[in-house]
């Protein structure tokens, strides 16, 4: 799950670079949405991983 969050974060950053660089004007809003979704998924994955690691010990 953490790998999916990191993947979405990378995709969002690439879309942001392309959008803010003027290549695709509409990609700016899409990049913002994907970026925040990726951040939320990353936080959820990190918390779930910490909880899982805590139970395994």
Swiss-Prot record:
Membrane topology recorded in Swiss-Prot or TrEMBL: Multi-pass membrane protein
- The domain of life for this entry's organism is Bacteria
Is this entry keyworded Repeat? no
Give start-end ranges for the coiled-coil region(s). Answer: none
The answer to whether UniProt assigns keyword Metal-binding to this entry is: no
Recite the UniProt keywords alphabetically: Cell membrane, Membrane, Transmembrane, Transmembrane helix
**InterPro entries under this entry?**
DUF1328
The similarity comment for this entry is: Belongs to the UPF0391 family.
Q: List the disulfide bonds.
A: none
For this UniProt entry, which residues form the secretion signal? none
Stretches that traverse the bilayer:
4-24, 30-50
Can you say where in the cell this protein is located?
A: Cell membrane
Q: What is its main location?
A: membrane
Instruction: Identify one Gene Ontology CC term for this UniProt entry.
Output: plasma membrane
The name this protein goes by in its record: UPF0391 membrane protein Xaut_1725
């Amino acid at each position: 799950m953490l790998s999916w969050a990191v993947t979405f974060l990378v995709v969002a950053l690439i879309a942001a670079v392309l959008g803010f660089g003027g290549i695709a004007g509409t990609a700016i809003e899409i990049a913002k949405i994907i970026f925040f979704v990726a951040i939320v998924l990353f936080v959820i994955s990190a918390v779930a991983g910490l909880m899982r690691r805590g139970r395994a010990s």
